[in-house]
Amino acid sequence: MDKGEEDQDVSHQDLIKQYRKPLETCTNKCFCKKCCYHCQFCFLRKGLGITYHAFRTRRKKIASADRIPVPQQSISIRGRDSQTTQESQKKVEEQAKANLRISRKNLGDETRGPVGAGN
């Protein structure tokens, strides 16, 4: 064997050893391109977003429907005055009638001819 072939065998064995050893943890929190690709661990975790043995935080389970207390008030009472009172309806009607009278007076004061009549 040549010296070059021996070096190649040694380098292949080194690569296999490096492949089999566990990935070293990296404490760098940066997500720039240089930091994402500097090692296999960071590429998997930062570049691809793959994490192993990371437990997800879970929400507490919601109480079942029979345990939820029924509110004593109706929905319309709980809302912020969603139902209009009769007094406020009367005020609105009176204002609308007053505005209608004023606008009709303004229309009568105009001295225009009928629509469609050519001058």
Swiss-Prot record:
Region (Disordered): 65-119
GO molecular function: RNA binding; RNA-binding transcription regulator activity
Cysteine-rich as annotated region, ranges: 26-42
One cellular component (GO) term of this entry: host cell nucleolus
Compositional bias ranges of the Polar residues kind: 71-87
Gene3D superfamilies linked: Tat domain (4.10.20.10)
Gene Ontology biological process terms in this record: positive regulation of viral transcription
Stored Pfam families: Tat (PF00539)
Subcellular location(s) per record: Host nucleus, Host nucleolus
Keywords: Activator, Host nucleus, Host-virus interaction, RNA-binding, Transcription, Transcription regulation
InterPro entries: IV_Tat, Tat_dom_sf
UniProt similarity note: Belongs to the lentiviruses Tat family.
Function of the protein: Transcriptional activator that increases RNA Pol II processivity, thereby increasing the level of full-length viral transcripts. Recognizes a hairpin structure at the 5'-LTR of the nascent viral mRNAs referred to as the transactivation responsive RNA element (TAR) and recruits the cyclin T1-CDK9 complex (P-TEFb complex) that will in turn hyperphosphorylate the RNA polymerase II to allow efficient elongation. The CDK9 component of P-TEFb and other Tat-activated kinases hyperphosphorylate the C-terminus of RNA Pol II that becomes stabilized and much more processive.
Additional comment: The 155 isolate is from a monkey imported from Kenya.
Protein name, UniProt field: Protein Tat
Biological source species: Simian immunodeficiency virus agm.vervet (isolate AGM155) (SIV-agm.ver)
Designated gene of the protein: tat
